[in-house]
Amino acid sequence: MTTETRSLYSQLPAIDRLLRDSSFLSLRDTYGHTRVVELLRQMLDEAREVIRDSQTLPAWCENWAQEVDARLTKEAQSALRPVINLTGTVLHTNLGRALQAEAAVEAVAQAMRSPVTLEYDLDDAGRGHRDRALAQLLCRITGAEDACIVNNNAAAVLLMLAATASGKEVVVSRGELVEIGGAFRIPDVMRQAGCTLHEVGTTNRTHANDYRQAVNENTALLMKVHTSNYSIQGFTKAIDEAELVALGKELDVPVVTDLGSGSLVDLSQYGLPKEPMPQELIAAGVSLVSFSGDKLLGGPQAGIIVGKKEMIARLQSHPLKRALRADKMTLAALEATLRLYLHPEALSEKLPTLRLLTRSAEVIQIQAQRLQAPLAAHYGAEFAVQVMPCLSQIGSGSLPVDRLPSAALTFTPHDGRGSHLESLAARWRELPVPVIGRIYDGRLWLDLRCLEDEQRFLEMLLK
């Protein structure tokens, strides 16, 4: 060991001496003595490795307390960090889908702080059913006889099939054998549920007679799957639920539908493309309809099944129901969200998903113009900051073809180098509240459709 190396090792402080420093008092109070000591030992080992490999001290050796604070602050950050979603996708699966209404947030907080009547009947002091209150709400909204709630729509489809068709055949159009994110495929779910898939028709055309010819003594269900995340256009043919229900009654086979996104209001009244609604399918005579809670409905992640009382009873008594049931926080948020639908005149104000989807392009354009000047002043040396028209999408497999006119702030590097865009996007992801946009066509786009808190946005980007 050289004299220089020995000198560097001698400059490493003892842990006891560091802990006596006043700058470590607040760190020990915040993070605990044990964790601070563990990190200091780790940092000393790192410093020794740097000395051994490069004959120098790490730069942070000049201020140990500052480095410890920085590392422990980063370590303490939640894995679920709030972000500003400016991707242009309103229901972004990777960013948690639907924002919750204030009523839902308050309901969850109350359910977490206190014991609640999850499965307790106050009238007779006996055991209640956790789905009962929500089932009543869902029946009121959809016109169904009963309802069942599980933890997501994939679970709803699995339970629906396992409880009503295990060991039997389920007839589905070939054009409706969907795959959604995470490799969730209808044929795979059927196998897990113990069903045999009997596909009929072709990818683009399926007729009533295709279903009729497929039905046999082992047929349990006729199934419709709403192709919410893709669209088949051109020379196509599909029969709707009402026609399939009529055929099912003739052949004594119930009809079930996986609706996917599931909107409880007619979106066309807000100028949005119309999606099929559970209440329409119930009115048409479908026995069971499943849909998501955290997509167009605007609530928490949940799988909702509405339909005929006898069919729902089979789901409730199936062993999978307990494995897939929703917890009290989910039920609290979902109940609060559903209650908003009882007052439809205020829905577009109180339900964040609908509020964001219905923002007009003109309003967003004005917002973009208001924000352009301070951002151009801050970033103008490196980037041209412009207001550009763009198209938002709903996301989460909802209305895949339709786009919503919007406006964006775009950042274009003066030197045209894409690496500068990547660097800027990375810097924004490292902010205390990360700002998430998208890089496209030589620009970094910030679609402002989902931006409601302008002050926080500017605080982050003008740092």
From Swiss-Prot:
<dbReference type="GO" id="GO:0005737">
    <property type="term" value="C:cytoplasm"/>
</dbReference>
<feature type="modified residue" description="N6-(pyridoxal phosphate)lysine">
    <location>
        <position position="295"/>
    </location>
</feature>
<keyword id="KW-0963">Cytoplasm</keyword>
<dbReference type="InterPro" id="IPR018319">
    <property type="entry name" value="SelA-like"/>
</dbReference>
<keyword id="KW-0648">Protein biosynthesis</keyword>
<dbReference type="GO" id="GO:0001514">
    <property type="term" value="P:selenocysteine incorporation"/>
</dbReference>
<protein>
    <recommendedName>
        <fullName>L-seryl-tRNA(Sec) selenium transferase</fullName>
        <ecNumber>2.9.1.1</ecNumber>
    </recommendedName>
</protein>
<comment type="subunit">
    <text>Homodecamer; pentamer of dimers. Binds only one seryl-tRNA(Sec) per dimer.</text>
</comment>
<dbReference type="Pfam" id="PF03841">
    <property type="entry name" value="SelA"/>
</dbReference>
<comment type="function">
    <text>Converts seryl-tRNA(Sec) to selenocysteinyl-tRNA(Sec) required for selenoprotein biosynthesis.</text>
</comment>
<dbReference type="InterPro" id="IPR015424">
    <property type="entry name" value="PyrdxlP-dep_Trfase"/>
</dbReference>
<keyword id="KW-0808">Transferase</keyword>
<dbReference type="InterPro" id="IPR004534">
    <property type="entry name" value="SelA_trans"/>
</dbReference>
<comment type="pathway">
    <text>Aminoacyl-tRNA biosynthesis; selenocysteinyl-tRNA(Sec) biosynthesis; selenocysteinyl-tRNA(Sec) from L-seryl-tRNA(Sec) (bacterial route): step 1/1.</text>
</comment>
<comment type="similarity">
    <text>Belongs to the SelA family.</text>
</comment>
<dbReference type="GO" id="GO:0001717">
    <property type="term" value="P:conversion of seryl-tRNAsec to selenocys-tRNAsec"/>
</dbReference>
<keyword id="KW-0711">Selenium</keyword>
<keyword id="KW-0663">Pyridoxal phosphate</keyword>
<dbReference type="GO" id="GO:0004125">
    <property type="term" value="F:L-seryl-tRNA(Sec) selenium transferase activity"/>
</dbReference>
<dbReference type="Pfam" id="PF12390">
    <property type="entry name" value="Se-cys_synth_N"/>
</dbReference>
<dbReference type="InterPro" id="IPR025862">
    <property type="entry name" value="SelA_trans_N_dom"/>
</dbReference>
<dbReference type="InterPro" id="IPR015421">
    <property type="entry name" value="PyrdxlP-dep_Trfase_major"/>
</dbReference>
